[in-house]
Amino acid sequence: MIPTLYEPFRHWSEKGSVYILSDLHFDDADCKFMSPDWITPQEQISIINGMVMKSDTFICLGDVGSPEYIKDIKARKKILILGNHDAKGAYKNYFDEIYTGPLFIAEKILLSHEPVYGLPWCLNIHGHDHNHMELYKEGCKHINLAANVCGYTPINLGKIIKEGVIADVPSIHRMTIDRQVERGKKL
């Protein structure tokens, strides 16, 4: 159980772990242009299922490609945040929950398909960018999970939280209080 998740999302972790990956692009013809060593859908499923158990939740941050491969992922729950290549109605029979835009799932954690900038008070876990991306960009902390960037390997959300990846991300509440104190001093 990940207790820091907001209430609507806590059920994702009540019976297992939460794994996240993006930009699977199953059977998309342009994958080889993005990365010449793009692996097959079957190879991707094998990597995913090597980590994700039947009791876990799998979150895809968009750009699924051919949806029929999703049924081969052995997770208990499958969640999708739509990407720029995803048609809204195409995945309703393959995912348990589908979201259309960026999603704050905890105080300091934002899931999105495309990177979101200008939010130094949260960790943005996203995909979309098929090049390697530095952890900090434009003052914001990011984890890029485009499949080809992260070795087609999903991350375990609970594990990265325990490892302290968000420990150095300031709280928006703290930032608001600090700014108010600064304003008060200027008066």
Model segments located where?
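N-terminal active-site segment of His-dependent metallophosphoesterases
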Residues: M1-Y69, A146-V149, K162-E163, R174, ...
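Generic structural signal for beta-strand residues in well-ordered domains
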Residues: H11, M51, K71-I73, F104, ...
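A general structural motif
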Residues: K15, S55, A75-K77, P120-W121
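Active-site neighborhood of phospho(di)ester-bond hydrolases with catalytic His/Asp-centered motifs
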Residues: I20-S22, F58-D63, I79-N84, L111-S112, ...
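Metal-dependent catalytic neighborhoods of phosphoester/phosphodiester hydrolases
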Residues: K32, L61-R76, L82, A87-A106, ...
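Short coil/turn linker and secondary-structure boundary residues
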Residues: I39, L82, Y152-I155
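Conserved beta-sheet core of the metallophosphoesterase superfamily
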Residues: A90-V181
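Metal-centered catalytic cores of metalloenzymes
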Residues: L187
